[in-house]
Amino acid sequence: MSSRTSSAGERAPASEPSSAREPKAGTGSGPEADHRASGASAINTAIKHRPALSPSRASDFKHCPLLYRFRAIDRLPETPTPVQVRGIVVHAVLEELFGLPAEERLPDRAHDLVAPAWRRVREERPELAELFGAEDDGQAMASWLASTGELLDGYFRLEDPRLVQPEARELLVETELGSGVLLRGYIDRLDAAPTGELRVVDYKSGTAPREFNEAKALFQMKFYAVVLWRLRGVVPRQLRLMYLADRQSLTYTPDEAELARFERTLDAIWQAILKAGKTGDFRPNPGRLCDWCSHKERCPAFGGTPPEYPGWPEPDAGEESAVDRAD
């Protein structure tokens, strides 16, 4: 069952965590979420990692198998947009905010964290210094920073961070299912009650979806719920998406039977990926979002030519390939 709330300064429920454990595990550089711009930096193709399924890559394959290939196998670079980078900065600020003593988690302090967060992002990704172009007189940058502050204001309308003590922030979670598929993702925030109940929180810098699109929005959260269920043996009590632009929350309470079904869905997606990976037959799926795709010029649906298929990535060439084991 899902439910929505709007900006009402929601207080933490009685089962909110009271202890402070902050195992900030692995921030990494993988293209895992909307705020980690997918494939935005070139990857050393000489280094092969064991393929894993993340929420973003699973969604890519469902939407367009060729896009999955470009991002997960070819690891082609993409240039993030100002909107995407704004999301990165907002997430960085909220992560930093929860590192402060509870009494200091105030709107003014969050705004003070924006400029340092933006500076760190530029240091990690120097190419983003040209985000607004050489012709910018500073007004575009100022407007962009102001819009970042507005998203933070939206967050404070949804929640009082002084009442929440997360167990973890930017938490890397990973588990292997019985079928062999490796699931991996980053959770923005994990809250744990003294009773052991878990709440998964994800920040979105956009607006809440319409009700008929809720299932698509919750795909990512159910993914995290499956991983936590398999890692800890506990079904999260609540999955919460916080949409900062229009100050709405979408909450969902999963159950074990539903997560078991969703696990089978992930298995099916992975088997389809392996089947395509065997031959490199990742087909395009043209649609209304193609105009915003960074790879449109190399897509055969629009007269382009994809790069030569590099083959399925395996960490050890001496091992039997997962693709070889696929039906």
What feature does the model see in each segment?
Residues 258-294:
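Polybasic (Lys/Arg-rich)
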